[in-house]
Regions:
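Active-site pocket-lining/capping segments in soluble small-molecule metabolic enzymes
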Residues: 1-151, 156-300
Length: 300
């Protein structure tokens, strides 16, 4: 069933609070700047020093109540990224993470969600915070289509983020029933090498760091790894999903959810994602001027 609206799930609710505090009013008051076929489905993230955290080592410092107040004001779902894959029973009693879940369950008028990897954690959360919904994390590295089919069939998950290497498996993706298509949340702008075999190890390294374990730094051996993340490089990735792909392929096929990564990047690059994926080209300069660009700004 063709979808009329694409929903973006945006990075850095804690990490880029100041950016969203400027961007969201603009998105509401100047809707003509932005594509009418897209909207914001959620903003995800986690504060620093959360043992349940995963995917990226969290560095967000903003007050959780202010984060929730901002998402509530604009009717956006807030998600906690609690995708640590190595949790043990003793970690479930962590006071900080439990307090965050209680807050997100209690105070957000739009239902909040948790991005999870650990079955142990999800079982605990279902019992203690039943009003939260669950997102199956891309850190599970679901690279086989049958894994994705099975995961989207699970009632526990409202959304499932597959590995980016399944993004272009169109024949198999189109075979999913509509109810399962509605759950698939594609990771659009991944820069990871398509031939990487260490992706799960990379995520596990982050999980160990968030648990406070002493561990060696994961060394990425992908071609060009020394350059770090570059959006131009991500656009050349075989799994990259651009705006034309979303409009011309995914939405007609019945898919409507798209995740933008970027929690570990800088706010300037995250703004470029918002410009590319959401903003009409003729208004991109207007958005830059509203957020940071003025006639006295020096770059050097």
């Amino acid at each position: 069933m063709k979808q009329e609206k694409a929903y973006y799930h945006l990075p850095g609710s804690f990490e880029f609070y100041e950016l969203y505090r400027e961007f969201l009013p603009l998105f509401r008051t100047h809707r003509e700047y932005f594509y009418d076929w897209c909207d914001i489905g959620s903003i995800y993230g986690a504060p620093a020093d959360c043992v349940w955290g995963g995917g990226r080592a969290g560095f967000g410092e903003h007050d959780p109540k202010e984060v929730l107040a901002l998402t509530r004001e604009y009717g956006i779902s807030a998600r906690l990224t609690f995708s640590n894959s190595l949790l043990r029973e003793e970690h479930l009693s962590d006071k900080k993470c439990n307090a965050l879940c209680a807050l997100f369950e209690r105070e957000n008028q739009v239902q909040s969600g948790i991005i999870v990897n650990s079955e142990l954690l999800m079982d605990y959360l279902k019992t203690h915070y039943p009003q939260l919904y669950f997102v199956s994390s891309t850190t599970k590295v679901l690279t086989e289509f049958q894994q994705l089919r099975a995961e989207t069939a699970r009632e526990e998950f409202r959304y499932v983020v597959p590995d980016f290497r399944l993004n272009k498996a169109f024949g198999e993706l189109d075979s999913l029933p509509q109810a399962q298509k509605d759950k698939v949340e594609f990771l659009c702008n991944e820069c990871c090498w398509v031939g990487c075999r260490d992706r799960k190890c990379c995520y596990e390294n982050v999980s160990r760091k968030n648990l406070g374990e002493a561990c060696p730094e994961h060394i990425c051996t992908a071609p060009g790894a020394e350059e770090g993340y570059r959006f131009s490089k991500a656009m050349e990735n075989p799994g990259f999903i651009g705006i034309r792909d979303i409009q011309d392929v995914y939405m007609p096929m019945g898919f409507s959810n798209f995740k933008i990564e970027g929690r570990g990047l800088g706010s300037a690059l995250v703004l470029e994602f918002l410009l590319y994926y959401m903003t009409k080209p003729e208004y991109q300069l207007h958005v830059r001027e509203a957020i940071y660009l003025d006639n006295m700004l020096d770059l050097f």
